Amino acid sequence: MSLKSLLKGFKRPKKIEFNTEASTPNYGKFVAEPFERGFATTIGNSLRRTLMSSIEGAAISAIRIEGVNHEFSFIEGVAEDVTRIILNLKQVRIKYEPEEKDQSKIIHLELKGAGYFRAGDLAVDSSIEIMNPDLHIATLNEDANLVMDLEIQRGRGYVPAEEKKKDIEVLGTIPVDSIFSPVQKVVFEVSETRVAQRSDYEKLTLEVWTDGSVSPDDAVAQAAKILKEHLTVFINFEEELEEEDDELDEADEKLKASLSKHVEELELSVRSLNVLRSLEIDFIGDLVKRSEEEMSKSKHYSDQCLQELKGKLSTLGLSFGMRDF
């Protein structure tokens, strides 16, 4: 069975609505509709789990401090002990794009005298961007001489320090718990939506928060690609996959032609045309997106006009409140 035949009759979103007004580098809201009942929950939950666990990011994986052999040490001239410094370093959010895949980076720091060690001090070159540069790491007095190396790696999810101990080669290197995931929170909501006269379809609203090293829309796109690649192994009709998913059948072509017509082609009365002009509706596609309540806002509106418009749309198999095209 071809992919086109397999999907016949299924209502699926044609595009994702991205709320640009509310979006920030750390937050994005996405709306997709319509879905057949049950599909919005399935897709929303799958995207949420993938976003939280499988998007790649960067984090500090190990540190080495001159004169320190283990994490339960104190450093002369530094108020915080090594354990507290490590806890603070775990919170640093980093954007790092290596020149070569799986390439780690060593940052060398030398801090002398009184002052504050903040996350922004780790941005030693253009390949490193710190997303929370004001994060406090340590307080130094005039006797301080803090010399340290930090290793930055890319990865997925959460990797505890215990798993890294076997890879430590340099004496005095302390492995650090790494939170690689740039996605901090994902919430999805499923609600009912109407398509023509049916109100039993579903709308998926997805909200994504990141640390800024990856934009929310990029994170969603990556999650969708990961899911897609995992599902292809279950497909055993490869030839059908080559067909264009969005290929329009004859009915779709007819609908597209109707929606692109100018409203004057409906041969309406002057009063009804005035209603459409006052609402700046020029094409049938614009008209069917409106609700009956929206139409009543025109000063030329009358029940007779509404009935005429509904009748004309009905002859084309259309109605008010259509959004699925």
Swiss-Prot record:
Record protein name field: DNA-directed RNA polymerase subunit alpha
Any single GO CC term annotated in Swiss-Prot or TrEMBL for this entry: DNA-directed RNA polymerase complex
Organism in which the protein naturally occurs: Leptospira borgpetersenii serovar Hardjo-bovis (strain JB197)
GO biological process: DNA-templated transcription
Record carries keyword Nucleotidyltransferase: yes
Self-association and partners: Homodimer. The RNAP catalytic core consists of 2 alpha, 1 beta, 1 beta' and 1 omega subunit. When a sigma factor is associated with the core the holoenzyme is formed, which can initiate transcription.
UniProt comment concerning the protein's domains: The N-terminal domain is essential for RNAP assembly and basal transcription, whereas the C-terminal domain is involved in interaction with transcriptional regulators and with upstream promoter elements.
Reactions listed under catalytic activity: RNA(n) + a ribonucleoside 5'-triphosphate = RNA(n+1) + diphosphate
Family: Belongs to the RNA polymerase alpha chain family.
EC annotation from Swiss-Prot or TrEMBL: 2.7.7.6
